[in-house]
Amino acid sequence: MPIGNNKDNDGTTLNISGLTISDKSSSTSSNNNTTTTTTQTSEPYVPPSRRNKMNNSSGSSRDDYPSPSDRDNRDSPFNRDRRDDGYRGGNNFRENNSNNNNNSRDNYKSPSFSRNNNSNGGGSSSGSGGWDNGPREQGPPRGNSYSYSPNNSFSRGGNQGGYGNRGGSGSSFGKPANKNDRYYDRWSNFRDSRNHPEMKREFIDLEEHKAEEIFKKNDDNIGIDFNAYDDDDISIETSEHICAPLNSFADVDLGDVLLGNIKHAKYTKPTPVQKSALPIILKNRDLMACAQTGSGKTAAFLFPIISGILLDGAPEAPPAYKPGVPRAACPRALVLAPTRELAQQIFDEANKFSYGSPVSSVVIYGGAEVFHQINELDRGCDILVATTGRLVDLLMRGRVSLSKIKYLVLDEADRMLDMGFEPQIRQIISEFDMPGCRDRQTLMFSATFPKQIQNLAADFLYNYIFLKVGVVGTTQNITQRIEYVVEEDKNSYLLDYLSGLKSDGLCLIFVETKRSCDTLTYFLNQRNFPTTCIHGDLTQPERENALQSFRSFATPFLVATDIASRGLHIGNVNLVINFDLPTDIHIYVHRIGRTGRAGKKGLAISFFNEKNKPVGAELLKLMKASNQDIPDWFEKMVHNLRMSKGPSNSKSNSPFNKSYNSHHNRDDNRGGYGGGGGGNGGYSNNRNDRREDKSDYSMHHPYFSNNGGSYN
């Protein structure tokens, strides 16, 4: 209790447990070797449990609680935190006091409350919580807000009915915090040596652990001997010769930063598609490139894009901030991909090769949290890698603008059309603010280019060059084998084959349906083959975890549907098994292309039976074109199919047989076999239609005119 001049305290000295207290003066005396201290009692008595608190805090006493009115303000609905729906005042506030870890009630220290009738909303709009270091920014008055500052080191602003952000922080009106300030700062401090020769940078070899972390995260192309591509048998055809192919990356000036990253990634020589595509793209020409899978198409378009962005320098300043109006990201390069996995992979490569530069890359795709992707866009974006659906969504929201696009890339373009994305592609290019084909550079890459893709190129590419490298769609580095296995014996045959497998690489097994994917994965795991799976019903985190487990050899067997057949660069895949053959030969091409990548040898085994007859003829043709060993039984089976006649041997309404009969009518130059009102005779007309389509397309590009309209 406080000690003062009253009836219990008349000014005399009191001795409490050896402590002498007086209200007059301070002195020190010694009696019987005992030291007593006399102190002035101008301050109230403080218990021992509070002394440590007073020494380490600016609080004056235990009784220094906020007034009742302030405590009422603490419970005001305007002081709610939207993140956890709790109150910021009272006991919900937890003080972080590094000098005192005692959690007793005596250690409670109240924040100081103040009412501000001219609130600006306070705080930073970029933070995720409700706290903001430093003073609030001043802005125009809006409503009433309550703020409190424990130890005067924090402040939080909220506004009544205002523009509070997700996470509980208020919005500032006068000078909003800009998330991409660092982005523009990086660009303002960067000078490209091609524009500023005095800024010439020497190649600096990174420390081993840092290079391992940055450039070997995706080790698909690390250590690969690209000399395996230097084969005179590899043909390179272009519709127009404008420059000689490259012999090394140093033949063109890509900039010091990019050339250094290429060395760090141990890219010693360009692959054939890179040799021809790089100079064409650097000449600012549109390109439609067809090259074998795993030949380095991703680097072929990323290198010129990163180099061009660095040469152009800092982007234009964003438009002025308007309250309530979202600020759109304005990328300079857009890469469209058919799947999330391929988009993520391209993004990783873009990050790797733009290391040490201000170039910023962002990836957006469906199945992931859209608010996180919007946050990334707000931090600045030069290269945007996207799937079509999520991009259309953000374009409609006004969070992305295509007005500054200088480079447009369609990767695995035929796959996007196969998946039904053509309307979205046309919408993105034509219905939003993307520059016209004469004002941007458009690049299309894929392993196959059927007629539908050629028409798309004719619509969106301007004065383009067609590039074809090697065997279209497949590679001679892959050994293809075909085995006759009936449906009932597939599991046991697969088990016997894997049991005798001596390879230390990865094995990728393709099936037709999602149910088969789960069933076969369970079957192999039960028999001690570590297996994971990937298909369309899995969430994006589940897909990423499965791919990471496969890449890291934790589960060296991956069962997948065709979602994994396109564009995925997974190193060390030595074996691909077509447990279920596809009905489209182009899908087969991309499936087996997951092995034999970048100069390595690979093996592809396919299980064939009566169910797969419709694709047999195309498969035989493809195997012959790549000089594969063909079993006699397979060749005889396909020959017998060709010799079969009449509607009794085929169902004219079957889509598979339509494709099959159409193929043979073209090869044999035959008419229809009659019957069914001339139903089969219609295939001869399809052949003529196909010729007319070729002739029509030959008007779009001289290459197809000179080659009879064929891209093979």
Swiss-Prot record:
Q: EC number(s)?
A: 3.6.4.13
Motif window: DEAD box: 411-414
Give the main EC class.
hydrolase
The GO cellular component terms are: cytoplasm; nucleus
Q: Where is this motif: Q motif?
A: 247-275
Q: Which residues form a coiled coil?
A: none
Q: Which SUPFAM superfamilies match?
A: P-loop containing nucleoside triphosphate hydrolases
Q: Where is the composition biased (Low complexity)?
A: 25-42, 90-119, 140-157, 644-662
Q: Where is the composition biased (Basic and acidic residues)?
A: 61-87, 687-699
Q: What is its main location?
A: cytoplasm
Catalytically driven reaction(s): ATP + H2O = ADP + phosphate + H(+)
- Residue spans of biased composition, Polar residues class: 11-24
Q: Its Gene Ontology molecular function terms?
A: ATP binding; ATP hydrolysis activity; mRNA binding; RNA helicase activity; translation initiation factor activity
| Keywords carried by this UniProt record | ATP-binding, Cytoplasm, Helicase, Hydrolase, Initiation factor, Nucleotide-binding, Protein biosynthesis, RNA-binding
Comp. bias intervals (Gly residues)? 120-132, 158-171, 671-682
Q: Read off the InterPro entries from this record.
A: DEAD/DEAH_box_helicase_dom (IPR011545), Ded1/Dbp1_DEADc (IPR044763), Helicase_ATP-bd (IPR014001), Helicase_C-like (IPR001650), P-loop_NTPase (IPR027417), RNA-helicase_DEAD-box_CS (IPR000629), RNA_helicase_DEAD_Q_motif (IPR014014)
Which compartment or compartments is the protein found in?
A: Cytoplasm
Where are the annotated segments for Disordered? 1-183, 644-712
Give every Helicase ATP-binding domain span.
278-467
Q: What is the similarity comment for this entry?
A: Belongs to the DEAD box helicase family. DDX3/DED1 subfamily.
Describe the task this protein carries out. Probable ATP-binding RNA helicase which may be involved in translation initiation.
Protein known as? Probable ATP-dependent RNA helicase ddx3
